Amino acid sequence: YSKDRAYAFENQLNENTGSVMVKRLQDYRKPESEAMIPMMVFAPTIVNDGRRLLISPQPISYLTTHRNDSNFNFKTTYDEVEFSDLFREQQAGNIRFSSVLRMNATFPYILPAVSLPSEPMIQVMDAGIRDNTGMKTSLRFLHTFRKWIEENTSGVIFVDIRDSHKERPIEEQPRKTFIENITTPLGNIYGNLLTIQDYNQDESYEYAKAWLTSPFDFI
């Protein structure tokens, strides 16, 4: 593997932060299991097929399956892969924590995609391509443990920390050239990718109120 600018970026980040993140992923397993720190789930996007690569110090294979408690027969696709299972032979838990952060935040064009030692080789990029605010992961976790949550907690609060407003004004489109008329529709779809995610996640959030009986609030 070549030492590209992403590798240099990670090393510089560790130097600037006093090497506080130069730990192995598995070093966080015990603090998480003892509730000393929050549970972390990272989900960079696999460039090859668009699925999400779920990374956590804890086993999280339950997040890669769609639990169906009804008799409705539907053949679903699996859109998540568990990192620790896929790279079990490569001792996945020994990956550097700062490398996990870099994979999760590899924004297109800013940093090159991260290549991983699978067969065939897969590349991953920013988690925001599929789930920019983590709502998809959070709702799946909530759905998996909803019965335990209903019996053992007083409710659920989602805290959404954003860098932009959810509602954006419609931009006025000036008169365009012939080439711009061809390229603008595709460019607008790409530019509104996060807005489309907001629409889908708001819908999922509303549906969650139907299958969770505990108090449920969003901040």
Language-model features: locations:
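Catalytic domains of lipid- and phosphate-ester/thioester hydrolases
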Residues: 1-219
